[in-house]
Amino acid sequence: MAHKKAGGSSRNGRDSESKRLGVKRYAGQEVISGNIIIRQRGTQFYPGANVGIGKDHTLFATAEGVVKFERKGPRQVRTVSVVSAA
């Protein structure tokens, strides 16, 4: 019997491409208008002063300055602001 039995097939072996989410500019870093600060799924962080939000919830600078992270309100909502570099 010079035959080899058929090898088993695997139903695994797939994965999606990483989306490169996360913080792109950290607290204290200088940014210019249009710089992406955070890429996220949903609103883990909310926009504060001088920060806009895209349709995919990306936070970006709308003015020149320094990135500032803070927690606001009774729910301790995480916000990101851009304050003028003093």
UniProtKB/Swiss-Prot annotation:
Key words of the record: Ribonucleoprotein, Ribosomal protein
Keyword hit for Ribonucleoprotein: yes
Signal peptide span: none
A GO molecular function held by the record: structural constituent of ribosome
One Gene Ontology biological process: translation
One Pfam match: Ribosomal_L27
Name of protein: Large ribosomal subunit protein bL27
UniProt organism field: Acidithiobacillus ferrooxidans (strain ATCC 23270 / DSM 14882 / CIP 104768 / NCIMB 8455)
